[in-house]
Regions:
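Extreme N-terminal, non-catalytic leader segments
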Residues: 1-16, 173-174
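Inter-motif core of Ras-like GTPase G domains
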Residues: 42-59, 71-87
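Beta-strand-loop-alpha "switch" segments that mediate conformational coupling across diverse proteins
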Residues: 107-137
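C-terminal boundary of histidine-terminating zinc-finger modules
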Residues: 130-159
Length: 175
């Protein structure tokens, strides 16, 4: 638990903090993709203006177990003044999850208010952080940010934020 503010910039502070359950969880990518979010640097940002936190993990067993541990810490009052909004599970591979991992996600889901699953997005493997579009709640509903406004056709990758990231971002912002 941080006893000093994590946010040291003079810019507007983030509304939501992303706490990585482990290295490589995806916090940097998600913080870049969601305008109101920032990485907490592996600590509970209890001294910051906005204490809202989303735990981020990959969908492999070690990631899910660590996210569950952190969720239980928060639930047990060990996260200072932070308010846990939920857990974002980022797919670690394409395809369907094995049954044991699905069950672990269900256990985590029962322990938190919200759980957002981010599927495997191949486009993220080839994009630099600078190329990632940003979902911003000020730009309107996620539905309008992920489809062409006239034709309702899908927009080419990387010209708009991926629909899965947009809808998860919107869900987190509304939580």
């Amino acid at each position: 638990v941080a006893d000093t503010p994590v946010w040291e910039n003079t810019d507007r502070p983030p509304v939501v903090w992303l706490v990585g359950a482990h290295g490589g969880a995806g916090t940097t990518t998600l913080a870049t993709s969601w305008a109101p979010a920032a990485e907490a640097g592996g600590v509970w940002p209890a001294a910051d203006k906005y204490p809202y936190v989303v735990i981020v993990c990959r969908s492999h067993l070690a990631g899910l177990e660590r996210a569950h541990e952190l969720a239980l810490q928060a639930k047990g009052g060990l996260a200072g003044t932070c308010e846990l909004l939920g857990v974002a599970v980022v797919a670690d591979a394409p395809g369907k999850l094995p049954k044991a991992l699905r069950q672990k996600i269900e256990v985590i889901s029962a322990a938190v208010s919200h759980l957002w699953e981010i599927p495997w997005l191949p486009v993220l493997r080839e994009a630099s952080l600078a190329e990632l579009p940003e979902w911003n709640p000020q730009d309107g509903p996620a539905e309008l940010q992920t489809r062409h406004p006239l034709r309702r056709a899908r927009i080419a990758p990387m010209t708009q934020v991926d629909k899965h990231l947009a809808f998860a971002g919107e869900g987190i912002f509304k939580a």
